[in-house]
């Protein structure tokens, strides 16, 4: 057998060695890069899975996503999120939370952003276009309301003094033979209605017959808007695109569609559905306040207190407009003046005719406003600005409003504004942080009926994680991952 002698040059040996080194280097780089990619894939899959564990009732009832940090156990620890990441096979990756956002952070900004995104996608901007031209008028009503409250207080105090004088005059002549002359029976007194409102509250005269005011209440100290909240950290992108006015209008429409208010079953939105028939307002939230929007506006501890406050604000607005209508109606002004002459004669104060006339006009406007509120609470509409032909209460009917039990009712004008329209205006006039945090109060109270441990400041909406993995020998690879509900 012939032997073959082989040989290789030094150059070829070196070249072959370099080639092998290059090949193995490529393979090592591929292993490292593959490990990086696999780690990212594992982490992405895990974080998507974690954020898929959103609170179901929160999403279904309020269209807002959030992870219950305690997973309904009451153990609110950020480590729970890390454990869930590992559960979803994030491998040997080491996770460290660098940023976390809760629903209540920055006065509920995260909650509000999700609501706006939902409303914009679900309904679009056409929903609020018709209101953009009225916001300036709404802002003017704040001044009118304040001025009218001051004027009404002054007038009511004056009416009380007149009533005291009339009572004193009546007691002096009682049982005595007096010459025939002007008299004013108690049931004819036009000032009693305003006196009752001041002493017993507006609810005593406006609740429709057969209707009962809710007695539900909450402990304010435990609400998200009052208690010390868990705060997130880190920097996250914020939602942009809409101007402040449009955002307020859009958010308020969400509130009107989602939350309850006084006697909503009588209103034009009684079914709690949107245009497509999808149910929105959940009327069966048994543990929630019945008048949620009134709470969002006033922030008091009971339905009765909140309704009283909202209705009195509404009463002041109506009395302002009704007084203006009366002042222009010469026929009714003459009626008021004639009654003022009678009262001044009884008081032996002829110089008091003009002040008495103004008090009678205010009381008359107050009586008409009581009728307006009865209509509104009955689900009907009233003219935004009254005209003489739309006036309902006569001067002689004022005392009847005290004893009729709500049976004296005005007619539905078929046009004008309803109770929900006034709620919309009042919501627009409140500050954004205050409205948002009280919304979260209502969300918590409603969800407590099924999940007593639910807390809005323990609901995660955005998360930033720094991840670390050993990809090869002692080589570490670090990368950030961000995820959030937008």
Kindly give the residue locations of the regions a language model identified:
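Long, compositionally biased low-complexity segments
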Residues: 56, 63-486
């Amino acid at each position: 057998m012939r032997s073959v002698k082989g040989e290789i040059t030094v150059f070829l040996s070196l070249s072959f060695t370099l080639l092998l080194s290059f090949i193995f280097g490529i393979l090592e780089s591929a292993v490292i890069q593959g490990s990086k990619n696999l780690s990212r894939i594992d982490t992405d899959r895990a974080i998507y899975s974690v954020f898929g564990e959103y609170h179901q009732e929160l999403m279904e009832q309020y269209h807002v996503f959030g992870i219950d940090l305690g997973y309904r156990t009451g153990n609110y620890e950020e480590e729970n999120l890390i454990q869930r990441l590992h559960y979803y096979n994030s491998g040997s990756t080491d996770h460290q939370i660098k940023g976390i956002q809760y629903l209540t952070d920055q006065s509920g900004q995260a909650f509000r952003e999700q609501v706006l995104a939902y409303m914009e996608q679900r309904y679009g901007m056409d929903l609020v276009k018709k209101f953009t031209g009225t916001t300036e008028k709404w802002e003017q009503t704040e001044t009118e309301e304040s001025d009218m409250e001051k004027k009404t207080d002054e007038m009511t105090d004056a009416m009380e003094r007149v009533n005291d004088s009339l009572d004193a005059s009546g007691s002096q002549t009682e049982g005595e033979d007096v010459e025939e002359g002007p008299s004013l029976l108690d049931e004819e007194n036009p000032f009693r209605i305003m006196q009752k409102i001041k002493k017993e509250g507006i609810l005593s005269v406006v609740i429709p017959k057969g209707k009962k005011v809710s007695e539900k209440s909450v402990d304010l100290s435990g609400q998200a808007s009052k208690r010390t909240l868990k705060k997130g950290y880190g920097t996250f992108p914020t939602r942009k695109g809409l101007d402040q006015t449009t955002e307020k209008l859009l958010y308020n429409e969400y509130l009107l569609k989602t939350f309850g208010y006084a006697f909503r079953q009588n209103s034009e939105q009684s079914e709690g559905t949107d245009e497509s028939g999808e149910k929105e307002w959940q009327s069966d939230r048994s543990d929630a306040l019945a008048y949620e929007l009134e709470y969002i506006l006033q922030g008091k501890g009971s339905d009765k207190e909140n309704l009283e406050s909202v209705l009195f604000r509404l009463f002041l607005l109506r009395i302002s407009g009704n007084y203006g209508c009366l002042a222009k109606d010469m026929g009714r002004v003459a009626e008021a003046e004639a009654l003022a002459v009678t009262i001044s004669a009884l008081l032996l104060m002829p110089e008091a005719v003009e002040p008495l006339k103004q008090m009678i006009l205010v009381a008359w406007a107050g009586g008409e406003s009581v009728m307006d509120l009865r209509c509104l609470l009955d689900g009907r509409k009233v003219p935004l600005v009254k005209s003489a032909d739309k006036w309902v209460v006569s001067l002689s009917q004022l005392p009847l409003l005290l004893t009729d039990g709500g049976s004296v009712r005005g007619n539905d004008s078929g046009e004008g504004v309803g109770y929900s329209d006034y709620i919309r205006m009042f919501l627009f006039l409140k500050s954004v942080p205050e409205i948002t945090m009280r919304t979260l109060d209502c969300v918590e109270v409603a969800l407590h009926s099924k999940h007593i441990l639910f807390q809005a400041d323990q609901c995660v909406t955005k998360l930033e994680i720094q991840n670390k993995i050993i990809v090869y020998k002692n080589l570490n690879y670090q990368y950030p991952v961000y995820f959030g509900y937008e």
